[in-house]
């Protein structure tokens, strides 16, 4: 009952929020220093692992091959953001012209 697709997606987002919380109210420099701090690095690893494990459960429950999905998404992005138009730009694909 607790591993419904909906509950897994909610849990995945809650774990992502915990990852985000590690950076809350910190400067970019403080965030970049997290991996050098043993306690914070462990917290970062734990949150990343929680997210990965839940993502795997979501994908399994939904019948998604994550490798194939990632490859397909990269191909879509190549079409949306062609290098010759998008390189060095923060523009959304609809604004690249």
Segments and roles (model prediction):
Residues 1-48, 52-97:
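Flexible "arm" and connector segments at domain edges
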């Amino acid at each position: 009952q607790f591993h419904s697709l909906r509950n897994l997606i909610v849990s995945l987002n809650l774990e992502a929020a915990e990852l985000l919380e590690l950076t809350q109210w910190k400067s970019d420099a403080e965030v970049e220093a997290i991996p050098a701090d043993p306690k914070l690095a462990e917290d970062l690893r734990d949150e990343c692992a929680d997210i990965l494990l839940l993502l795997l459960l979501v994908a399994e429950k939904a019948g998604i091959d994550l490798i194939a999905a990632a490859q397909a998404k990269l191909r879509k992005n190549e079409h949306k953001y062609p290098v010759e138009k998008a390189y060095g730009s923060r523009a959304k694909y609809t604004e690249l012209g």
